[in-house]
């Protein structure tokens, strides 16, 4: 069960007329959560994440795919022991996902906490995505690396 309170933070970067963003803001404000707005440059969203360290991150597949691709590339570039450790940690957590477990005491502390800190999602409780399809392997990657549920929303705004 997800509880939202005054300690929660949301990075708002989606257009305010967007129904998804509007519903998110109303819900969070109703619960007393805080909302930080991005700098206005979508290329600097990762900087904004690092500054605000949100607990709730509604996003769109385009950005989540970008995060996935960048992290995968960094792991491949690191190579050697780091890549092997990541692969082992990832495989262990992938097994846990089958039973609905997002966390692993050893691998989260040893591997994934560093990634979460670097991205600015070390306090994340939930990610929510919508507006377009997103691949299952990307959703699983995000659940494994960021140790949280990633929910998909569907709707029609026309």
Report the location of each language-model feature.
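Residue-level recognition of the N-termini of beta-strands and the immediately preceding loop/turn
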Residues: 8-9, 124-126
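Conserved AMP-binding/adenylation subdomain of ANL enzymes
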Residues: 1-12, 16-109, 145
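Flexible, glycine/threonine-enriched loop-and-boundary segments that flank and lead into catalytic domains
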Residues: 109, 118, 136-137, 141-144
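Membrane-proximal helix-turn-helix segments that form the acceptor-binding/catalytic region
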Residues: 112-124
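Conserved A3 ("GATE") glycine/threonine-rich loop of ANL adenylate-forming enzymes
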Residues: 62, 125, 130-138, 148-158
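Active-site phosphate/pyrophosphate- and oxyanion-stabilizing loops and adjacent acidic/basic residues
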Residues: 43, 113, 140
């Amino acid at each position: 069960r997800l509880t939202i309170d005054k300690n929660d933070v949301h990075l708002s970067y989606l257009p305010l007329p967007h129904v998804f963003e509007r519903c998110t803001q109303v819900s969070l404000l109703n619960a007393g959560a805080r909302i930080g707005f991005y700098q206005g440059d979508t290329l600097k969203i990762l900087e904004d994440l690092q500054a605000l360290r949100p607990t709730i991150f509604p996003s769109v597949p385009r950005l989540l795919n970008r995060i996935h691709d960048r992290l995968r590339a960094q792991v491949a570039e690191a190579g050697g022991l780091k890549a092997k450790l990541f692969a082992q940690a990832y495989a262990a957590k992938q097994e846990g996902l089958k039973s609905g477990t997002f966390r692993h005491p050893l691998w989260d502390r040893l591997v994934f906490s560093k990634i979460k800190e670097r991205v600015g999602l070390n306090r994340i409780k939930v990610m929510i995505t919508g507006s377009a399809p997103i691949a299952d392997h990307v959703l699983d990657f995000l659940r494994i690396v960021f140790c949280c549920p990633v929910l998909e929303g569907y709707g029609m705004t026309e």
